[in-house]
């Protein structure tokens, strides 16, 4: 994407740190809201052990696992293709450009080039195409490109959120909490990226 191993290492470090940070913050928040019962882990362990004891057909379990994983891979590929087509349609119809006007004021306040507006909207919709567009923008400092990419990689985009929703829809997991967590991860990843670029010489990429 940037053809620079230092940038790849930088994004890896910041996203690892941001994921850990979000995990710690959400864990602390959950402890504040709910008092954990002493026997909850024992109950979960016993129930899972009982379920494992009822599985007699290993071949059936493996075939079902392979089938479900294959379906998931096809589904993810389908989401990427569909959202790539959507971005192309929105771009050709100038609708994407209209949406990009919403970012003009925030970008001006942050002293970021307005040419990032359309790529950011694309990245919010679909991650892969968005980060490629952001990385290709010519700006006064490449650090802007990297920080924006860090945010988009942390957030994941609407396409990724819908992929997760399609997988977790049959569970009791809260998609709202996941969205808030991903948004928080994107913001924290961008902050960590800014800090590392300005504090560590090997990541000083403003030149």
Regions found by a protein language model. Give the residues of each.
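Conserved, well-structured core segments that form the ligand-binding/active-site neighborhood
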Residues: 1-47
């Amino acid at each position: 994407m940037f053809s620079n191993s230092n940038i790849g290492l930088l994004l890896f470090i910041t996203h690892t740190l941001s994921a850990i940070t979000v995990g710690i913050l959400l864990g602390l928040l959950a402890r504040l809201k709910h008092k954990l019962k002493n026997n909850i882990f024992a109950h979960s362990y016993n129930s899972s052990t009982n379920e494992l004891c009822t599985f007699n057909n290993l071949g059936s379990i493996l075939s079902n696992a392979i089938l479900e994983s294959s379906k998931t891979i096809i589904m993810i590929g389908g989401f990427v293709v569909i959202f790539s087509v959507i971005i192309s349609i929105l771009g050709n119809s100038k609708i994407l450009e209209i949406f990009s006007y919403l970012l003009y004021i925030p970008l001006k306040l942050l002293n970021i080039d307005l040419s990032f507006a359309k790529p950011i909207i694309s990245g919010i919709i679909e991650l892969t195409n968005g980060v490629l567009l952001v990385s290709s923008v010519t700006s006064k400092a490449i650090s802007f490109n990297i920080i924006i990419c860090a945010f988009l990689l942390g957030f994941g985009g609407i396409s990724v959120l819908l992929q997760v929703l399609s997988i977790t829809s049959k569970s009791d997991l809260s998609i709202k909490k996941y969205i808030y967590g991903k948004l928080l991860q994107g913001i924290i990843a961008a902050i960590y990226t800014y800090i590392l670029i300005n504090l560590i010489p090997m990541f000083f990429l403003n030149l």
